[in-house]
């Protein structure tokens, strides 16, 4: 159903006055966006109003559900107990690609990871940028991307290739030049519907709404984390606030590096650089030549993934398992295997 212009005006006014949409209203707004039933001016106004008012978990969950339905999986979903590791971006910290390193490390430790990612949001180099630079074919056919999982235990879903419904909104989002609700929806709409997820947020006010959105979407297990010092992943700079989703319930905790047998380190120890620099860091780190801080921040975040995946029941054990894998260089082997599996020569 498409609402009348007056109805949309009233709803916009509701948002501008601090109101929150019901699940049904948020659903209708997203459906209208995808159907191009709103003018660019109306769409821009709604995006700005949502950004100004702040995030609501019910709205996010409803919008994500619509996007999921609009992006059906073009091949059979694997039944491997999948997990995803990603962040909302927007922390502006210019760290190296931590969540990308975590995906390959977690795979080397026994998790099965379907990483859903894109090009840079705020950092200098996004996950897609660095992986493409290391030779991954980002636009491999969907069946090829999925079929890589049994052997490699990790694959990469380049978001623009999997969400054709969002193509028409891309020019407007780009012209606005600011982060919108769509930046938060990206981590919620992995096309392979992972059973578990570690989701990093750049500000602590996103912890509860993102956890609520995951709960409303039926996520089995998840950890939503805001990194000490302002990262959108667990940090070594101090205790990290988290929301843990398990069996339909969300609980709040704090997890410090010391809890996992790791040492605190400043954010400067995690700095990245340009594309070439970040590629070098990722290759050295995954092949056993990373610095202590690089190894330990990846181990910290990998521990969360291993718990979500059910591979480890204890965060500390998970961190130590990740450190052992990194020291052996086995995560780099996973990346090499995935690069070969996604090669154009492998396309059928």
From Swiss-Prot:
- Quote the cofactor binding remark: Binds 2 magnesium ions per monomer.
The keyword Metal-binding is annotated on this UniProt entry: yes
Q: Which cofactor does it need?
A: Mg(2+)
Task: Indicate which residues the UniProt annotation says bind Mg(2+) 2.
Answer: 232-233
Associated pathway: Amino-acid biosynthesis; L-tryptophan biosynthesis; L-tryptophan from chorismate: step 2/5
GO molecular function of the protein, one example? anthranilate phosphoribosyltransferase activity
- Kindly list the positions annotated as binding anthranilate 2: 173
Instruction: Cite the InterPro entries for this sequence.
Output: Anthranilate_Pribosyl_Tfrase, Glycosyl_Trfase_fam3, Glycosyl_Trfase_fam3_N_dom, Glycosyl_Trfase_fam3_N_dom_sf, Nuc_phospho_transferase
What catalytic activity does the UniProt entry give for this protein? Answer: N-(5-phospho-beta-D-ribosyl)anthranilate + diphosphate = 5-phospho-alpha-D-ribose 1-diphosphate + anthranilate
Entry GO terms, CC: cytosol
Pfam families, alphabetized: Glycos_trans_3N, Glycos_transf_3
Tell me yes or no: is Transferase among this UniProt entry's keywords. Answer: yes
Q: Name one GO biological process term.
A: L-tryptophan biosynthetic process
The record lists 5-phospho-alpha-D-ribose 1-diphosphate as bound by 87, 90-91, 95, 97-100, 115-123, 127
- UniProt KW keywords: Amino-acid biosynthesis, Aromatic amino acid biosynthesis, Glycosyltransferase, Magnesium, Metal-binding, Transferase, Tryptophan biosynthesis
Q: Where does anthranilate 1 bind?
A: 87, 118
Q: What is its EC number?
A: 2.4.2.18
Q: Which domain of life is it from?
A: Bacteria
| Residues annotated to bind Mg(2+) 1 | 99, 233
Similarity comment text for this entry: Belongs to the anthranilate phosphoribosyltransferase family.
Subunit structure of this entry? Homodimer.
Query: Any idea what job this protein has?
Result: Catalyzes the transfer of the phosphoribosyl group of 5-phosphorylribose-1-pyrophosphate (PRPP) to anthranilate to yield N-(5'-phosphoribosyl)-anthranilate (PRA).
PANTHER family, sorted: ANTHRANILATE PHOSPHORIBOSYLTRANSFERASE
List the protein's name.
Answer: Anthranilate phosphoribosyltransferase
Species source reads: Synechococcus sp. (strain WH7803)
């Amino acid at each position: 159903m498409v609402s009348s212009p007056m109805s949309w005006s009233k709803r916009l006014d509701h948002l501008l006055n601090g109101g929150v949409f019901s699940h049904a209203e948020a659903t209708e707004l997203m459906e209208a966006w995808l159907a191009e039933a709103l003018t660019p001016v109306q769409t821009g106004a709604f995006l700005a109003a949502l950004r100004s008012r702040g995030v609501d978990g019910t709205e996010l969950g409803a919008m994500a559900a619509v996007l999921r339905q609009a992006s059906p999986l073009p091949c059979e979903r694997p039944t491997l107990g999948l997990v995803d590791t990603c962040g909302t971006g927007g922390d502006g910290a210019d760290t190296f690609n931590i969540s990308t390193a975590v995906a390959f490390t977690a795979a080397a430790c026994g998790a099965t990871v379907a990483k859903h990612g894109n090009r840079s949001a705020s950092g200098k180099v996004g996950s897609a940028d660095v992986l493409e630079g290391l030779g991954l074919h980002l636009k491999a056919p969907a069946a090829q991307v999925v079929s890589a999982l049994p052997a490699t235990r990790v694959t990469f879903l380049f978001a623009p290739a999997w969400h054709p419904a969002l193509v028409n909104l891309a020019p407007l989002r780009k012209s606005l030049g600011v982060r919108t609700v769509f930046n938060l929806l990206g981590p919620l709409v992995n096309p392979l519907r992972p059973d578990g997820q570690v989701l990093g947020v750049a500000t602590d006010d996103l912890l509860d709404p993102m956890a609520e959105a995951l709960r409303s979407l039926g996520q089995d297990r998840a950890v939503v984390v805001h990194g000490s010092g302002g990262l959108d992943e667990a940090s070594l700079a101090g205790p990290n606030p988290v929301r843990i989703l398990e069996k339909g319930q969300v609980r709040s905790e704090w997890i410090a590096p010391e809890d996992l047998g790791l040492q605190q380190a400043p954010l400067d120890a995690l700095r990245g650089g340009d594309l070439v620099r970040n590629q070098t860091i990722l290759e050295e780190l995954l092949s056993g030549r990373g610095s202590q801080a690089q190894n330990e921040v990846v181990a910290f975040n990998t521990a969360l993934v291993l718990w979500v995946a059910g591979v480890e029941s204890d965060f500390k054990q998970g961190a130590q398992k990740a450190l052992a894998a990194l020291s052996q260089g086995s995560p780099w082997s996973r990346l090499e295997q995935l690069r070969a599996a996604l090669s154009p020569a492998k396309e059928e």
